[in-house]
Curated annotation (Swiss-Prot):
Membrane topology: Multi-pass membrane protein
Top EC category: transferase
Protein name in UniProt: Undecaprenyl-phosphate 4-deoxy-4-formamido-L-arabinose transferase
Organism: Proteus mirabilis (strain HI4320)
Function: Catalyzes the transfer of 4-deoxy-4-formamido-L-arabinose from UDP to undecaprenyl phosphate. The modified arabinose is attached to lipid A and is required for resistance to polymyxin and cationic antimicrobial peptides.
This protein's record includes keyword Isomerase: no
Family matches, as CDD domains: DPM1_like_bac
One example of a Gene Ontology biological process annotation: lipopolysaccharide biosynthetic process
Pathway assignment: Glycolipid biosynthesis; 4-amino-4-deoxy-alpha-L-arabinose undecaprenyl phosphate biosynthesis; 4-amino-4-deoxy-alpha-L-arabinose undecaprenyl phosphate from UDP-4-deoxy-4-formamido-beta-L-arabinose and undecaprenyl phosphate: step 1/2; Bacterial outer membrane biogenesis; lipopolysaccharide biosynthesis
A Pfam family annotated for this UniProt entry: Glycos_transf_2
Catalyzed chemical reaction(s): UDP-4-deoxy-4-formamido-beta-L-arabinose + di-trans,octa-cis-undecaprenyl phosphate = 4-deoxy-4-formamido-alpha-L-arabinopyranosyl di-trans,octa-cis-undecaprenyl phosphate + UDP
Protein family according to the UniProt entry: Belongs to the glycosyltransferase 2 family.
Length: 326
């Protein structure tokens, strides 16, 4: 077993986006849970450009003395994982725990994650027990998990559950990565030597709706596909070769059939020509779209713009970094 530094402080990072209804209960339950820890703790809540009163409520919570709350206000919405990275940049705990603000994963699980990490793990993942989501979200999640496992070779049952714990050296390694599109559980596993996944409770969403719509889930799948591997580019070569061979064989078959049955059978070749043409055009558009995804990500990385811009930090205990360092 690897030798780990003792956990003296725990940081809990929570991205917040339009969660004003759940925030009072979230703060109360998370603070109560953290008070059970033997270690020092801090709560870092990152407002990801909310349009409701979430940012104001976070600032008020951070201004309460001895509340151990730090509020980070981003100037606009950058997405869940960018908001979490902003929280990582502020956190100074030996163990950093991420938690969603919707209370579907109970904050009461935090002490168990800390205890598990103390057993000598770099990353403590979680798997939702009796998941309270729609059939569509469960199915999409299974597809994404299978795709991630295939691409990374790391088998974990629930990459979509953000209730996770990361050792300090994993956080430091992730902060050195500056790609624009980041999926934190996968990024962490690329640096982790020892990982474990434990079951945690999962509740129905009590307030509001999920922030991941159908279109956002589709975008997430594209992000994961193009961030994880270049296998789709290699697949294009295989598909192109198969289409070329199939086209050649079909052409030979049509010539033979025309010689046997005559021009009337082939309808002068018009419909056959259209069928082959549409097949090739469809394959080309798919290939162009996929190549465009990769080129677009290269373009975004080359521009080297920050993942996020911090408008304000309230309750800060370390020097304010107004934006991520590149």
């Amino acid at each position: 077993m690897s030798t780990f530094e003792k956990i003296n402080k725990v940081s809990v990072v929570i991205p917040v986006y339009n969660e004003e209804e759940s925030l009072p209960q979230l703060l109360e339950r998370t603070i109560k849970s953290c008070k059970q820890l033997e270690q020092e703790y801090e709560l870092i809540l990152v407002d990801d450009g909310s349009s409701d009163n979430s940012a104001k409520m976070l600032e008020e919570a951070a201004n309460i003395e001895d509340n151990h709350v730090i509020a980070i206000i981003l100037n606009r919405n950058y997405g869940q994982h960018s908001a979490i990275m902003a929280g990582f940049n502020q956190a100074d705990g030996d163990l950093v725990i991420t938690l969603d603000a919707d209370l579907q994963n109970p904050p009461e699980e935090i002490p168990r994650l800390v205890a598990t990490a103390e057993e000598g793990y770099d990353v403590v993942g979680t798997r939702r027990r009796n998941r309270q989501d729609s059939w569509f979200r469960k199915t999409a999640s299974k597809m994404i998990n299978a795709m991630i496992t295939k691409a990374t070779g790391r088998s974990m049952g629930d990459y979509g559950c953000m209730l996770r714990a990361y050792r300090r050296h994993i956080i430091d390694a992730m902060l050195q990565c500056h790609e624009r599109s980041t999926f934190i559980p996968i990024l962490a596993n690329t640096f982790a030597r020892r990982t474990i996944e434990i079951e945690v409770a999962h509740a129905e969403r009590e307030y509001g709706d999920s922030k991941y719509s159908f279109l956002k889930l589709i975008n997430l799948m594209y992000d994961l596909l193009t961030c994880l591997t270049t296998a789709p580019l290699r697949l294009l070569s295989v598909v192109g070769s198969v289409i070329a061979v199939a086209g050649f064989l079909l052409a030979v078959l049509l010539i033979v059939l025309r010689l046997i049955f005559g021009a009337i059978w082939a309808a002068d070749g018009v419909f056959t020509l259209f069928a082959i043409l549409f097949m090739f055009i469809g394959a080309q558009f798919v290939a162009m779209g996929l190549l465009g995804e990769y080129i677009g990500r290269i373009y975004n990385d080359v521009r080297a713009r920050p993942r996020y811009f911090i408008q304000k930090v309230v309750g800060v205990k370390k020097p304010n970094k107004n934006q991520e360092e590149d």
